[in-house]
Amino acid sequence: LRLVIVGEGYMRPDFVATIEAVGGQSWVHMAGHVSDDELIDLYRSAWCVASASEREGWGMTMTEAAACGTPAVATDIAGHADAIRADHSGLLVDGEQGLADGLARLLGDAALRTRLQAGALLRAAELTWEHTAVANFEVLATGSVANARPLGTSGP
């Protein structure tokens, strides 16, 4: 088992210190900034991706991973809940303990992992620009028809 942390940021020294404090140097790899091709390879080789974010506008990492068939374990916040279909393409959890429990559950259950991998690919297919545009037009068209007034009338 190996944990790969991708990206750079102000918390890197804290992560390195924690990894050293728990003796994780042999199984935790701080990849730093990676190219798009390297990121895709990491997604494809991962059993899951994880996010403990407390705020997220959109779970782009979760969406990118899903497109590679990689399920997510993430905190149940708005951005993640938009990107992940709970118990279909990943697990949405509450808090640090929930994240730890969710990761243990996913990593320890091959059947669950396989089911969520398939669900991740299906969810990613729903998150294309074309699919989003069609869904938005359907909502607009339905609303327009429901609120239409006879020709020649004005106001409510």
Feature annotation, model-predicted:
Residues 86-97, 105-110:
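Conserved acidic donor-binding segment of nucleotide-sugar-dependent glycosyltransferases
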Residues 33-34, 41-46:
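Short alpha-helical donor nucleotide-sugar binding micro-motif in glycosyltransferases
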Residues 14-34:
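Nucleotide-activated donor-binding/catalytic signature segment of Leloir-type glycosyltransferases, i.e.
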